Amino acid sequence: MKCKPNQTRTYDPEGFKKRAACLCFRSEREDEVLLVSSSRYPDRWIVPGGGMEPEEEPGGAAVREVFEEAGVKGKLGRLLGNFEQNQDRKHRTYVYVLTVTEILEDWEDSVSIGRKREWFKVEDAIKVLQCHKPVHAEYLQKLKLGGSPTNGNSVAPSPPEGDP
C-alpha cells in the first residue's frame, strides 16, 4: 500500500476527497492508453491518479500524479470530466487527457513499490478495468462517446442574440 508521509488529503465542501487523474495516450490518435498496476493489488491495472494537495490546481495534480505513478511526462490536454465515486469511498476525480512525450526508465513508484505500466488498446483497457475499477472504465467510455472539455456535462449551444 502506498503511503506518503507528508500527504494531506483535501476535501471539497460536500465531503468528497479531491482527486486528479490522466488518461495517458501514446499519441494524439488516443487509441492506446497507459495503465499502471495498483499499489494494493499489483496484478490489477488502474488509471494513474491520486489525491490533490492543498492549494493545488486539478491539472497540476494530474500531471504530478502521472509522473509519480507512471513515470511519464506529456502535453496536458482537455478536461474529460469530473467523476464521482460514492460506493466504498467518496471521491470526486478531475480526469484529463494527456499525450505522452517522455517515458522515464525508472520512476518514483517503480523504485519504491515496484509499480508496473503497460500500453493497452482503449477497448482492451475498458475490459481490464471493468471488473475491479468500473469508474476508471467509465473515463474511457466517456472518451469513446466523444468526451469534451465541458466538465462532463452536455452543453447546448446558446441561441444567437435576438432569437427567442
Curated annotation (Swiss-Prot):
Chain span(s) of sequence motif Nudix box: 50-71
Class of the enzyme per the UniProt entry, highest EC level: hydrolase
Gene Ontology MF: a single term: endopolyphosphatase activity
Binding site for Mg(2+) 1: G49, E69
Top-level taxon in the UniProt lineage: Eukaryota
Keywords on record: Cytoplasm, Hydrolase, Magnesium, Manganese, Metal-binding
The record's free-text note on cofactor binding: Binds 3 Mg(2+) or Mn(2+) ions per subunit. Mn(2+) may be the true cofactor in vivo.
Listed EC numbers: 3.6.1.52, 3.6.1.60
GO biological process: adenosine 5'-(hexahydrogen pentaphosphate) catabolic process; diadenosine hexaphosphate catabolic process; diadenosine pentaphosphate catabolic process; diphosphoinositol polyphosphate metabolic process
Positions annotated to bind Mg(2+) 3: E65
Cofactor requirements of the protein: Mg(2+); Mn(2+)
Locations listed in the record: Cytoplasm
Reactions the enzyme catalyzes: diphospho-myo-inositol polyphosphate + H2O = myo-inositol polyphosphate + phosphate; P(1),P(6)-bis(5'-adenosyl) hexaphosphate + H2O = adenosine 5'-pentaphosphate + AMP + 2 H(+); P(1),P(5)-bis(5'-adenosyl) pentaphosphate + H2O = adenosine 5'-tetraphosphate + AMP + 2 H(+)
Region: Disordered, residue numbers: 144-164
Main location: cytoplasm
Signal sequence residues: none
Residues that hold substrate according to the record: R9, K17, K18, R19, S38, S39, R40, R89, K90, H91, R115, K133
Family that this chain belongs to: Belongs to the Nudix hydrolase family. DIPP subfamily.
Function of the protein: Cleaves a beta-phosphate from the diphosphate groups in PP-InsP5 (diphosphoinositol pentakisphosphate), suggesting that it may play a role in signal transduction. Also able to catalyze the hydrolysis of dinucleoside oligophosphates, with Ap6A and Ap5A being the preferred substrates. The major reaction products are ADP and p4a from Ap6A and ADP and ATP from Ap5A. Also able to hydrolyze 5-phosphoribose 1-diphosphate.
Protein name, UniProt field: Diphosphoinositol polyphosphate phosphohydrolase 3-beta
Organism whose genome encodes this protein: Bos taurus (Bovine)
